[in-house]
Amino acid sequence: MAKLHDYYRDTVVNELKAKFNYSSVMQVPRIEKITLNMGVGEALTDKKLLDNAVADLAAISGQKPLVTKARKSVAGFKIRQGYPIGCKVTLRGERMWEFFERLITIAVPRIRDFRGLNTKSFDGRGNYSMGVREQIIFPEIDYDKVDRVRGLDITITTTAKSDEEGQALLAAFNFPFRK
């Protein structure tokens, strides 16, 4: 079992319950899922780029990504409906906690020129989204085998009702927010 999951149950729940005066433990916000998305617009010309992106995302997340397809045709981007244009993974349960732990302890500190994550990236409902410019910050990616440096979007979906609660939840895990 992931250390952060135990830490959440033993420590964070009690801290947040006291801070926000919840009457029940079930009111305390928790992390519901983490979604990783990698858009590969260049996949229109070279299918191998999408295969490499899928392999990278599979290595990072530990499960097979879903290839996303264009919802509608856009002439300006030369995209037709149904073209594969990216891949995504939704992590829940044990894999989610393991990824979250690796993200906080290993990956985020390896970001170049890192000064903390922006606190304004909450969506108004307690969910946090962040972008990573290089997939090579994750230790599962072998730098020598990378054909192209790609970015990815990471969305942490919580059961928090407000941004303040969501930020308190992530801050309780020592999430590296900008001061």
UniProtKB/Swiss-Prot annotation:
The keyword rRNA-binding applies. Part of the 50S ribosomal subunit; part of the 5S rRNA/L5/L18/L25 subcomplex. Contacts the 5S rRNA and the P site tRNA. Forms a bridge to the 30S subunit in the 70S ribosome. PROSITE patterns: RIBOSOMAL_L5 (PS00358). PANTHER family: 60S RIBOSOMAL PROTEIN L11-RELATED (PTHR11994). GO terms for molecular function: rRNA binding; structural constituent of ribosome; tRNA binding. Pfam families: Ribosomal_L5 (PF00281), Ribosomal_L5_C (PF00673). Keywords: Ribonucleoprotein, Ribosomal protein, RNA-binding, rRNA-binding, tRNA-binding. InterPro entries: Ribosomal_uL5 (IPR002132), Ribosomal_uL5_bac-type (IPR020930), Ribosomal_uL5_C (IPR031309), Ribosomal_uL5_CS (IPR020929), Ribosomal_uL5_dom_sf (IPR022803), Ribosomal_uL5_N (IPR031310). Belongs to the universal ribosomal protein uL5 family. This is one of the proteins that bind and probably mediate the attachment of the 5S RNA into the large ribosomal subunit, where it forms part of the central protuberance. In the 70S ribosome it contacts protein S13 of the 30S subunit (bridge B1b), connecting the 2 subunits; this bridge is implicated in subunit movement. Contacts the P site tRNA; the 5S rRNA and some of its associated proteins might help stabilize positioning of ribosome-bound tRNAs. This is Large ribosomal subunit protein uL5. The keyword RNA-binding applies. GO terms for biological process: translation. The gene is rplE. GO terms for cellular component: ribonucleoprotein complex; ribosome.
